[in-house]
């Protein structure tokens, strides 16, 4: 049976793991969200999130955005290649509804998969 959990092994945890993604990444981006990724040696993708206070002032809004992205990753993790992915959130995402953010991030997962495989 397929597991849809978001365990510790599916997260980027250390600064070194985050830093490695920024060196020569595969990119998929929109005006509000950018995904950076590099292939990893694990048998699953891993996710790291950065939502800057500069773009999203309130903590509850930052948490809402991170929760939506984490949930989308959790549900789509079996369709995403074995990559270390960092999600960067930019200005404009705060005005988006939850459904819009979810639709956008799912589009970016597919775009990232195509760029990695193609």
Swiss-Prot record:
Keywords on record: Endonuclease, Hydrolase, Nuclease, RNA-binding, tRNA processing
Record-listed E.C. numbers: 3.1.26.5
Signal peptide: none
Annotated InterPro entries: Ribosomal_Su5_D2-typ_SF, Ribsml_uS5_D2-typ_fold_subgr, RNase_P, RNase_P_CS
PROSITE patterns: RIBONUCLEASE_P
An MF annotation (GO) of this entry: 3'-tRNA processing endoribonuclease activity
Keyword Nuclease: yes
GO annotation, biological process: tRNA 5'-leader removal
Catalytic reaction annotation: Endonucleolytic cleavage of RNA, removing 5'-extranucleotides from tRNA precursor
Record flagged with keyword Phosphoprotein: no
SUPFAM superfamilies to which the protein is assigned, alphabetical: Ribosomal protein S5 domain 2-like
Gene Ontology CC annotation, any one: ribonuclease P complex
Enzyme category, top tier: hydrolase
Top-rank lineage group of the source organism: Bacteria
Oligomer status and interactors: Consists of a catalytic RNA component (M1 or rnpB) and a protein subunit.
Known function: RNaseP catalyzes the removal of the 5'-leader sequence from pre-tRNA to produce the mature 5'-terminus. It can also cleave other RNA substrates such as 4.5S RNA. The protein component plays an auxiliary but essential role in vivo by binding to the 5'-leader sequence and broadening the substrate specificity of the ribozyme.
NCBIfam families: rnpA
Similarity comment: family membership: Belongs to the RnpA family.
Name of this chain's protein: Ribonuclease P protein component
